[in-house]
UniProtKB/Swiss-Prot annotation:
PANTHER family: MOTHERS AGAINST DECAPENTAPLEGIC HOMOLOG 2, SMAD. Residues 274-467 form the MH2 domain. Residues 207-217, 233-243 have a biased composition (Polar residues). It comes from Pongo abelii (Sumatran orangutan). SMART domains: DWA, DWB. Residues 207-251 are annotated as: Disordered. This is Mothers against decapentaplegic homolog 2. The modification Phosphoserine is found at S240, S245, S250, S255, S458, S460, S464, S465, S467. InterPro entries: Dwarfin, MAD_homology1_Dwarfin-type, MAD_homology_MH1, SMAD-like_dom_sf, SMAD_dom_Dwarfin-type, SMAD_FHA_dom_sf, SMAD_MH1_sf.
Length: 467
């Protein structure tokens, strides 16, 4: 390996020999970038080897990697190694590097008050799973520990297991098809749809006294995050829903009781672009729609879109832009990171300023009014959509008729403002009064609704937030 530094211990060379390589060279300058990456990987392995030599767990790590066996023992390091790995999102505007790790040019202090002294930050189990198993790993949301891991990240022990074969990739659950009766009555026009644009929504600071009930320990993010991973109680979701999580619902339990109807299964399929994002300044649409194909993307205020994972608002011009909008745009900074993993959508605030989210799906989970706007502080993340919850609501709404299904259209649209919030507690009471905001259209659920409505005998009108 050309990047190996002098005096590299043999065990480090052996472990680096098992490193998984990402496909492609990264285009122009890829050779230099790959060289820097290999040097960093060597440093990461050296640091881990140094820690494990002190505890006698080095042999177990090498055994796990060479045999690729999940039945090996836990390989642990102290979970308080924040001075090297970092356990929270930084509150400074720095570059997110090509490996998905935070890069720092100098010492910075994280949200939990600890001093960061390394040039990159990341969760240790994510770093080593990326190094030895999945080079395309983006986030801890994509990982879950195996059952026999005693020091899994989500258990929040004093030690954390970094055995890459003690973690699995989260798989996207298969949604059961919705059984839809074919109705003979054809509607000539769509019913009115309240998309909350002109209403004055309530406000909340998540989690503000809300404690989601769960039957298992959620894989929560590290300190400095707000998280609500895990399912909530059925009472919070909907008083009339059957007991059990959406994952346990089947086409039989979700289908209409009258089996004499002509029932047709309507299945969910993943689109090429999981969401489309439109940017607005006040009530004016600015720029073209961004179509997201990658499971992780950022919407930021910068001007250098390096790849398909960035929507840079700094590039967009608007002749009608006023001073308030200009000032707000300067504070967007690193903006928001959106993840689509395992049928769930997460929003993580990377900016120094809060973001404000209106997600009817999230609001229903917590028993809030559908139009409630939730403030997400810097360094925090929130689950803003869950495909399984939506599938359960869709199957239930089919029994209630066309209009009930059509009203679910608004659940597939998420609005998000930067820096400035809106609602009853703010001077700006509607989203179109905020200087900078975006609207996400979740294409998979919207296309599913299209197919269900068509099967029910609806007019051939595509679902959108503006329908």
């Amino acid at each position: 390996m050309s990047s190996i530094l002098p005096f590299t211990p043999p065990v480090v060379k052996r472990l680096l020999g098992w490193k998984k390589s990402a496909g492609g060279s990264g285009g122009a300058g890829g050779g230099e970038q790959n060289g820097q990456e290999e040097k960093w990987c060597e440093k990461a392995v050296k640091s881990l080897v140094k820690k494990l030599k002190k505890t006698g767990r080095l042999d177990e790590l090498e055994k796990a990697i060479t045999t690729q066996n999940c039945n090996t023992k836990c390989v642990t390091i102290p979970s308080t190694c924040s001075e090297i790995w970092g356990l929270s999102t930084p509150n400074t505007i720095d570059q997110w590097d090509t490996t998905g790790l935070y890069s720092f040019s100098e010492q910075t202090r994280s949200l939990d008050g600890r001093l960061q002294v390394s040039h990159r930050k990341g969760l240790p189990h994510v770093i080593y799973c990326r190094l030895w198993r999945w080079p395309d790993l983006h986030s801890h949301h994509e990982l879950k520990a195996i059952e026999n891991c005693e020091y899994a990240f989500n258990l929040k022990e004093d030690e954390v297991c970094v055995n890459p074969y003690h973690y699995q990739r989260v798989e996207t659950p298969v949604l059961p098809p919705v059984l839809v009766p074919r109705h003979t009555e054809i509607l000539t026009e769509l019913p009115p749809l309240d998309d909350y644009t002109h209403s004055i929504p309530e406000n909340t600071n998540f989690p503000a006294g809300i404690e989601p009930q769960s039957n298992y320990i959620p894989e929560t993010p590290p300190p400095g995050y707000i998280s609500e991973d895990g399912e909530t109680s059925d009472q919070q979701l909907n008083q009339s829903m059957d007991t059990g999580s959406p994952a346990e619902l089947s086409p039989t339990t979700l289908s209409p009781v009258n089996h004499s109807l002509d029932l047709q299964p309507v299945t969910y399929s993943e689109p090429a672009f999981w969401c489309s994002i439109a940017y607005y300044e006040l009530n004016q649409r600015v720029g073209e729609t961004f179509h997201a194909s990658q499971p992780s993307l950022t919407v930021d205020g910068f001007t250098d879109p390096s790849n398909s994972e960035r929507f840079c608002l700094g590039l967009l011009s608007n002749v009608n832009r006023n001073a308030t909008v200009e000032m707000t745009r300067r504070h967007i900074g690193r903006g928001v990171r959106l993840y689509y993993i395992g049928g769930e959508v997460f929003a993580e605030c990377l900016s120094d300023s809060a973001i404000f989210v209106q997600s009817p799906n999230c609001n229903q989970r917590y028993g809030w009014h559908p139009a409630t706007v939730c403030k997400i502080p810097p360094g925090c993340n929130l689950k803003i959509f869950n495909n399984q919850e939506f599938a359960a609501l869709l199957a239930q709404s089919v029994n209630q008729g066309f209009e009930a299904v059509y009203q679910l259209t608004r659940m597939c649209t998420i609005r998000m403002s930067f820096v400035k919030g809106w609602g009853a507690e703010y001077r700006r009471q509607t989203v179109t009064s905020t200087p900078c905001w975006i609207e996400l259209h979740l294409n998979g659920p919207l296309q599913w609704l299209d197919k269900v409505l068509t099967q029910m005998g609806s007019p051939s009108v595509r679902c959108s937030s503006m329908s």
